[in-house]
Amino acid sequence: MDTVLYGKNKWRTVVSIEIEICEVVDDEVVQAFEMLIPQLSKSNPPPSRTELEVLVKSEASTLFLAKLGGRIVGSLTLAMFRIPTGVRAWIEAVVVDDSARGHGAGESLNQAALDFAKANGAITVDLTSRPSREAANRLYQRMGFKLRESNLYRYELKG
């Protein structure tokens, strides 16, 4: 955390958000997801250590972590895959802890994912966001995401 002068006799504290790609699932990562996932979804339980390990080892997905003061405060999953017309990417499961919102973690996570996708040949990056997530939707639009005229369909395989 740094304090910087931004006007005559005015200072503000600047918080440094660090973004890293998760390569090892340890207790800290498991505990972070136990805290984060309920803030993202009321209907899905947090992933187990084994499920997180499968995610981290998958060649099709990259798990980004946001850290504030050395503590995991957010995550984003980037899924990348090839289709006949090129490499595509999807941003999924973006969540920032309530206590860390407003410090740029969401934007930093998304920018890291966009940079990674571009560096790895993706030609588009898509995401979905519920309309009720107003702050997230404003962020995505501010970052340059465009709302698409498209129908999104889901087929439930459970049961």
Residue ranges and their predicted role:
Residues 110, 117-129:
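Conserved GNAT acetyl-CoA-binding A-motif
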Residues 81-91, 101, 148:
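A conserved beta-turn-beta hairpin within the catalytic core of GNAT-like acetyltransferases
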Residues 96, 102-115, 138, 142:
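Conserved acetyl-CoA-binding loop-helix of GNAT-fold acetyltransferases
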Residues 107, 131-149, 154-155:
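Conserved active-site alpha-helix within GNAT-family acetyltransferase domains
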Residues 54-65, 85, 90:
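A short helix-loop-beta-strand connector motif used in the catalytic cores of GNAT acetyltransferases and
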Residues 24-54:
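Conserved GNAT-fold acetyl-CoA-binding loop/helix
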Residues 1-27:
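Conserved N-terminal entry element of GNAT/NAT acetyltransferase domains
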Residues 65, 71-80, 90, 95:
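Conserved beta-strand in the GNAT
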